[in-house]
Amino acid sequence: MPKGTAIFIERSKAENMETRVAVMSIIVEKGESAEQINSLLHEYGEYIIGRMGIPYRKRGISIISIALDAPQNAISTLSGKIGNLDGVSVKTAYSTVISKE
C-alpha cells in the first residue's frame, strides 16, 4: 500500500463518523524528534483546529498544544504515534461533546 493510502482510507470512512474535540499536550525533551512530530501533525492536519508551540529554553524542552476535531480513532492513533517517539511524552484530554462529521 503506498504511503498515505491508509490515512486516506481512514479519512474517507470518517466522513460519516462521529467526531470529538480534544486537546493534545506534547512535551519534547529531545529536539531530534521535532521533524517526526511535524510530519505526523502535517499528516493529520485536516483535523487540527489550532496549534501552539512554546520553546522552554531554560529547561531545554518544547511544549506543544494541539486542538483537534476528529474521529476518536484518529485522535488515538496520532497520540500513540507521537507517544512512541523517543524523548516525547503526550497526554490527550477529550470533550464529552460528540458531533456527526
Predicted regions and their residues:
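Long, contiguous binding/interaction regions
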Residues: 2-101
